[in-house]
């Protein structure tokens, strides 16, 4: 059941260009770096940015941190990342939607690149490529083990941070709320298909993010290769038990 509270810290600024949506479930260890990266990327767009932190069953200091950065705060208790992100998009007032995970940092040039891509009229939106905070053989092969099956199932896409006009986000009904995992790849595929129908390309901004290695730090760099069932569940997309274990009930992820 959805439990969505009225947003607090609502931004009444006019002419908001970017609405940046962050789903957050107990992210006190990571979200400051994410918000600091957004602040740096936003310097050329003063008073044109709103950051919406969708608080998901938080029991730590995530809400307090979001408040200290003057973010718009919205509570949603669904164990479903699609519903969490869509709740943020629903209240967004910007013409451009950007979604980023709380353990990810955007590049300083990220917003200017999004602005450039969309202003060209050639792109429907897109994703980014990036890097992990650290790399090892285990992390490298784990990434390959995920990427190759995704390419076969969803085609040539990029994920990580998504960006598109809000009107296009709404046209494809946002993230698929029937999916509990791999909802990002599904969103990318549908956005790309929507772009083709409108004679626009799906764009990929290179070197657009740095993401944490928290799962590798917790479980080991080779853990994914030792447990291929996780990969199969991810590709399936609607395995509730695996989704809860991997994301929604896991405080050490």
Report each predicted region and the residues it spans.
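Short, well-formed alpha-helical segments that are part of the catalytic scaffolds
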Residues: 3-9, 27-42
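Cell-envelope/extracellular polymer assembly enzymes that use nucleotide-activated donors
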Residues: 17-19, 50, 186
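Short beta-strand/loop segment that forms part of the nucleotide-sugar
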Residues: 47-57, 74
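A conserved acidic beta->alpha catalytic loop
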Residues: 55-63, 104
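Glycine-rich, basic loop-to-helix element that forms the pyrophosphate-binding segment
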Residues: 76-92
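Short aromatic/hydrophobic "clamp" motif used to bind/position activated sugar donors
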Residues: 97
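Conserved donor NDP-sugar-binding/catalytic core segment of glycosyltransferases
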Residues: 108-137
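A short, conserved alpha-helix in the catalytic core of glycosyltransferases
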Residues: 168-173, 179-199
């Amino acid at each position: 059941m959805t439990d969505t509270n009225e947003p607090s810290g609502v931004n009444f600024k006019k002419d908001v260009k970017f609405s940046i949506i962050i789903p957050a479930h107990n992210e006190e260890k990571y979200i400051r770096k994410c918000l600091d990266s957004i602040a740096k990327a936003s310097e050329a767009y003063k008073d044109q940015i709103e950051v919406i932190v969708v608080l998901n069953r938080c029991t730590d200091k995530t809400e307090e941190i979001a408040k200290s950065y003057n973010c718009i705060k919205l509570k949603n208790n669904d164990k479903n990342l699609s519903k969490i992100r869509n709740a943020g998009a629903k209240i967004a007032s910007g013409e451009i939607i950007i979604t980023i995970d709380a353990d990810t940092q955007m590049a300083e040039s990220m917003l200017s690149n999004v602005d450039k891509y969309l202003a060209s009229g050639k792109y429907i939106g897109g994703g980014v490529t990036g890097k992990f905070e650290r790399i090892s053989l285990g992390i490298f092969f784990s990434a390959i083990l995920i990427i190759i099956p995704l390419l076969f199932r969803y085609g040539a896409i990029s994920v990580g941070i998504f960006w598109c006009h809000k009107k296009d986000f709404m046209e494809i009904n946002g993230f698929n709320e029937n999916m509990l995992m791999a909802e990002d790849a599904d969103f990318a595929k549908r956005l790309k298909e929507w772009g083709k129908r409108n004679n626009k390309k799906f764009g990929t901004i290179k070197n657009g993010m740095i993401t944490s290695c928290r799962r590798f730090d917790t479980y080991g760099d080779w853990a994914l290769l030792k447990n291929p069932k996780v990969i199969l569940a991810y590709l399936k997309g609607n395995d509730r038990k695996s989704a809860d274990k991997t994301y929604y009930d896991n405080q050490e992820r």
